[in-house]
Design a protein with these regions (language model features):
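FAD cofactor-binding and catalytic pocket of flavoenzymes
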Residues: 1-6, 16, 120-124
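Structured catalytic cores of enzymes that bind and process phosphorylated ligands/cofactors
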Residues: 2-4, 9-11, 29, 33, ...
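Active-site-proximal substrate-binding core of FAD-dependent oxidoreductases
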Residues: 2-6, 24, 39-80, 84
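Short FAD-binding loop at a beta-strand-to-alpha-helix junction that anchors the flavin cofactor
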Residues: 5-23
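A conserved FAD-binding loop/helix module that cradles the flavin
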Residues: 20-42
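C-terminal auxiliary extensions adjacent to catalytic cores
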Residues: 77-124
Length: 124
């Protein structure tokens, strides 16, 4: 997320710019968003580094933080997580919110099921 993605007239987009969701490895949506941002920056002479971070930096950083937490899980922790995820109230949230935008997803999960906070012991 702190990678420089523009230097003079050279621009990085997608995997080369680390614009991937660390939780899933997916990069199509972030890459398309970045390409749209880059077009706007070139046309309007804006700083692509700054504009991309403003638009998508927080979301990709949260994906990375979630991945770092999941990497510390034991099998027992995954069992607890799946137990929480299997509740109807949680399933409704998962259907409503897109995993490409984890901030509203995580906030709503925490509001509806505060026991997700137990996983914060792994660090955020």
């Amino acid at each position: 997320p702190n990678k420089m993605i523009q230097k003079e007239n050279v621009y990085l987009v997608g995997d080369a710019a680390t614009q991937v969701k660390a939780t899933t490895g997916g990069g199509i949506i972030p890459s398309l968003k970045a390409a749209t941002t880059l077009c706007d920056c070139i046309i309007n002479k804006k700083d692509y580094n700054k504009e991309f971070k403003k638009q998508s930096g927080r979301e990709l950083l949260l994906h990375l933080k979630i991945r770092n937490v999941l990497n510390k899980f034991s099998d027992r922790d995954y069992d607890k997580l799946l137990g929480l995820m299997n509740q109807e109230k949680v399933k409704k949230i998962l259907k409503k919110y897109d995993r490409d935008t984890p901030i509203p997803l995580v906030l709503n999960l925490l509001l509806r099921e505060p026991r997700f906070l137990l996983f914060s012991k792994f660090g955020f």
